[in-house]
Amino acid sequence: MEQPRRYGDRFTAHTAVVTGAASGIGAATAERLAQEGAAVVLADIDQERGTAVAERIGGEGGRARFVTADVSTEEGWERIAAAARDFGPVDVLVSNAYTVDVAPAHETSLDSWQRQLAVNLTGAFLGFKAVLDDLRARRGAVVLTSSVHAHKGIPGHPAYAASKGALLSLCGQLAVEYGPEVRVNAVLPGPILTAAWDRVSAEDRARSVAETAAGRFGTPEEVAAAIAFLGSHEATYITGASLLVDGGWSVVKSSA
């Protein structure tokens, strides 16, 4: 069996919470933090896949626990925080959970709009509040998963883009209000090859690749590496920042 890659021990004796951890960037981040020594609480609404990720981490010698939770509710965060206490105070919070409905603004229902903002934005706000005492005591770090579409619109994604833009405002606000005790940063992924691309036509996939300077899709593991850096002691003078992980997509779009 292939052995898991080892990256170091930046998170030894640390506890991390990762939401949206059943797949994609969230799963890759949970695995990366565990590989670097963290005890990780994974949260998602997908119990089957989330449990599988936690079991995979455990099988590789890591410490992980999965919690089924809706991050848009206080009850969901009570469940997550309780699970984290079994490991210890939270040092790193990665708010990565999101949902998206594809429709132009005039066809987006109020229910759809509110649900997307509840998960994508309110979930990050509630998570910060739920573990703030731990973060303050541990001088911890928060990483919010935004998107390149916080800056540049994408047809059919009004609520998604609005929520991702609002996350950047929340990032700056929390960094100012809770520094120097807590650092808060955001990553802005570009075209990352996750399961969401399975629903996209080959033509549109090729167009997205052509719009990157790197000439390819990114991987969830590459975003996880950026998140791990921002959550680590190597980034102690970085807060309120927005880190693009987009293969140069933003530069190409700006010059077009």
Model-found features: residue ranges?
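Substrate-binding pocket helix/loop in short-chain dehydrogenase/reductase
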Residues: 104-105, 109-117, 197, 208
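Active-site helix of classical SDR
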Residues: 128, 163, 171
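Canonical Rossmann dinucleotide-binding motif of NAD(H)/NADP(H)-dependent dehydrogenases/reductases
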Residues: 7-41
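Residue(s) in the substrate-gating loop at a strand-loop-helix junction
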Residues: 147
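Active-site loop immediately N-terminal to the catalytic Tyr-X3-Lys motif
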Residues: 106, 152-158, 215, 233
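Short C-terminal tail/terminal secondary-structure segment
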Residues: 2-7, 152, 228, 239-256
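Alpha-helical segment proximal to the catalytic Tyr-Lys
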Residues: 133, 175-180, 236
